[in-house]
Amino acid sequence: MTPPIKSPSSSSVDYGKLSEQLMIAYTKDVLQRNLQKFHGEQHRQQFKQLLNQPVIKSIHSLSGIIVRYRHNNSELDKALDTIDLPKIFERLEIREKTNKDKNLDYDDLLVLELLNYFKNDFFKWVNSPDCPSCGSNEDVQGLGAINPSSSKTISQSQAIIDQVSVIEVHECKKCKQKIEFPRINNPVTLLTTRRGRCGEWVNCFMLILQALIGGGDDDSDRIRYVWNQEDHVWCEYYSLSSKRWIHLDPCEGVYDEPLLYCNNWGKRMSYVIGFNYNYMIDLSDKYIVPEKQIPKNSIVNVQNVNFVISYSNGINQLKHFKRIEQQQQQQEVDVNEQRNLAFLKLYHNFLVPYNKEINQLKPELTKTTPSTDLPSGRQSGSTEWTKSRGENGES
């Protein structure tokens, strides 16, 4: 008589090891599919052709933007040296004592205080630049824009250092003097100039935010640049206590109000894309209510956008896997263990956070109750300007 087959007892199964094996197998499968899908010549050519489309080109140009705020310790140190840390932490202490929201932890309160300090004490909004002769900006008229190479006030080398994208030309009606206003993208330069519109505000704010909460290791991924096709940018940070990405708008000094733009400004939007270190993600469902949704296909082919996001994320995962592998090679472990550790790191740092967020962004899960405390309409910018952009709360 054949003896019955005994199932392994629970004590003989190493569930931790089994779990790791499943994670490694899943990550291997994802990377293999990425290699097959995105390293082929057909997909490379498809991606290259799509970059001829303006919206696709804009999205791709931002795919590596977070690197701007990371990895340069001297720039992060300069950010901390430039801001008034004693004032920030003094106010933070008051926030801690008066805070009644149990969902806000120390990091969250620090971000709130930085938001307040940055808007009210550090950075200045520019409707029109001040006239260097009379000091007024009340009677300054915009005349258009020029390339940095045509500037009469900024050298080409300085324009490159400051990452000047374009230079606005204005004229003071009182003095008849031409005024150049360079649109600066270098966040380190902005620590000194401390003025601009939403692009400058977000660039400078994110460098300081990274310096304060970003962490010093390669695995840290807590700040995100958020781009809107209809000419606005803002940012998010990952809250360790809430375990989610939280909306921040430094221009408005607003925290965790994703429906600010649709419900308070009355802004109609098509696409909202987020860019953090590990991946890019379509955040449109988080920020756009159905009645303010500009049909995406009226702007750009939705499938093309989805392909570019998937392609960029897939290539990014492969690059990061190689980087992690190289780091593991410095450890005194065998080659197989090095690869397995790299697979596990990729699983925890990339695949789990991305998949979790994708699930959280399902339309039925992203409904947010707008704050009744927020004023109607955009607060930064002149009345005429916000009205012309459909952001004054009347539409």
From Swiss-Prot:
Zn(2+) binds at C131, C134, C172, C175. GO terms for cellular component: cytoplasm. Residues 366-385 have a biased composition (Polar residues). Residues 363-395 are annotated as: Disordered. Residues 386-395 have a biased composition (Basic and acidic residues). GO terms for molecular function: metal ion binding; peptide-N4-(N-acetyl-beta-glucosaminyl)asparagine amidase activity. It catalyses: Hydrolysis of an N(4)-(acetyl-beta-D-glucosaminyl)asparagine residue in which the glucosamine residue may be further glycosylated, to yield a (substituted) N-acetyl-beta-D-glucosaminylamine and a peptide containing an aspartate residue. The keyword Cytoplasm applies. Its cofactor is Zn(2+). Its main location: cytoplasm. Binds 1 zinc ion per subunit. Its EC number is 3.5.1.52. Keywords: Cytoplasm, Hydrolase, Metal-binding, Zinc. The active site is at C198, H232, D249. Substrate binds at E252. It is found in: Cytoplasm. This is Peptide-N(4)-(N-acetyl-beta-glucosaminyl)asparagine amidase. It comes from Candida albicans (strain SC5314 / ATCC MYA-2876) (Yeast).
